[in-house]
């Protein structure tokens, strides 16, 4: 229903079930329920028009498919959920820990290599009642599994999307990919990819101050962006984007010419997306 009309849902103990707001402004309620449990819906005193849709989703799941949503109540132990990646891709996971009165959910990704499961990232912490917590990986073709550990009082909604990424990047300065003014480029690093990559921009006017927006979306590590002016060996700027910082701004000098941007990983575990915008 419409949020402004304040539809409320209560469980069998008459405790209010908390709602999350969907992208289109509707209210969505979710809670782990026992078979035969009764819920109560309180309608507003004044009603214009309200649509109420109810449904039951099975608790617990095994393997995963892209764009499907799964629900699982915590067991106190780690549960594993296999999935496959067919092409080099940016893979974005969304985990929502629904019960605000519960505790933290933990998650990480493992890859199957030579018959053994190998962990490829740091642990992600999903706080209670934190909806739409996203974390992104750069993954190659292969078999993977999502590991989740949640308290028995927590209910998690889990989904992922996958977007294939071309490996057509420049590993040499002489082959640097050009970024046009008011344009941007993005790609991924996987755990096995180590070589630095090169991009370039052209500053054609000294009247306006130009900037580079340097961004990342990773679970582990981060990226180093080193900026050079054509003809100069010494870098004019070095910027690291890591930790909680999703992006940093590099202010460019008011000097005409070609400038090169070299991007490199900060750690072996670094995997995920990066973005360079020129404005």
Which functions belong to the PLM regions below?
Residues 5, 42-57, 62, 103-105, ...:
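Edge beta-strands of jelly-roll/beta-sandwich modules across compartments, strongly enriched
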